[in-house]
């Protein structure tokens, strides 16, 4: 799966405040290279659920096409669960990738321990190889799985910035801020929308002078509530991967 940014709820770190009721939503996306060539399509869902008696959000995605780092067309299914108690924080995710004909290629899992601020990353290949890595993470860490659905809850009421860390699938942790860049009218396969443009700005410490060398990433969310995601421009799977344009193909069904 997916207004100026609101003043955030401070809970020891900047966290996005969940709504009292999470809307059930679903739709489709179409992804093209910057040159216009079609790369892949996907269907996604978002719903509220309970996890261990606490409020959570589940995102799913099923896609097919050409996506980095695979040289051939693949299929995948993804499920990601986020805590929605006090602030929105990732709990776990699983992504299963197969060939176009259904032959298993790789399974990726992330499990977040919110009490100890750690994440365990696992990658298992069909030939028996596996990779495991554990990282310490700040409380404001966001996972890429479901991030567009989470950012729609920024609020978009007042000028502000969201400072956070983003965990990629490398896996690597990036310090970023999400900054509003005004409003634009955006045309997508799902229609035309008045949308807020949000830039994801990387922070590189003493290397910030080289920020211009990093690929830019932008998200667009509708001005009209519930501020659903309509467009993304940026790297497909982190630095070094193809720049893409991802658009809403059809709105909620």
Task: Annotate each PLM feature.
Residues 4, 115-119, 129, 142:
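Intrinsic disorder/low-complexity detector
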Residues 121-123, 249:
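Terminal leader/tail segments of proteins
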Residues 8, 121, 134, 171-173:
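Generic secretory/membrane-interface signal
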Residues 3-17:
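Bacterial Sec-dependent signal peptides at the C-terminal "C-region" and cleavage site
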Residues 124-158:
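Surface-exposed beta-loop interaction hotspot
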Residues 13-116, 158-253:
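Acidic, serine/threonine-rich low-complexity disordered tracts
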């Amino acid at each position: 799966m997916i207004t100026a940014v609101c003043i955030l709820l401070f809970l020891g770190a900047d966290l996005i405040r969940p709504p009292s009721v999470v809307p059930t939503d679903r739709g489709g996306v179409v992804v093209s290279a910057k040159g216009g060539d079609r790369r892949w399509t996907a269907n996604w869902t978002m719903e509220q659920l309970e996890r261990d008696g606490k409020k959570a959000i589940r995102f799913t995605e099923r896609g097919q096409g050409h996506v980095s780092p695979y040289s051939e067309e693949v299929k995948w299914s993804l499920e990601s669960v986020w805590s929605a108690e006090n602030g929105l924080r990732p709990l776990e995710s699983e992504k299963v990738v197969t060939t176009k004909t259904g032959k298993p290629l790789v399974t990726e899992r992330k499990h977040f321990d919110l009490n100890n601020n750690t994440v365990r990353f696992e990658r298992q290949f069909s030939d028996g190889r596996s990779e495991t890595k554990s990282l310490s993470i700040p409380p404001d860490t966001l996972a890429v799985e479901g991030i567009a659905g989470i950012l729609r809850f920024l609020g978009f009421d007042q000028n502000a910035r969201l400072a956070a860390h983003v965990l990629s699938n490398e896996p690597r942790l990036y310090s970023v801020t999400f900054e509003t860049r005004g409003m634009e009218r955006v045309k997508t396969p799902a229609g035309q929308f008045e949308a807020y443009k949000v830039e994801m700005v990387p922070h590189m410490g003493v290397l910030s002078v080289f920020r211009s060398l990093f690929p830019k990433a932008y998200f667009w969310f509708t001005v009209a509530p519930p501020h659903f995601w309509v467009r993304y421009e940026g790297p497909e799977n982190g630095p070094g991967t193809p720049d893409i344009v991802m658009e809403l193909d059809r709105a909620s069904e």
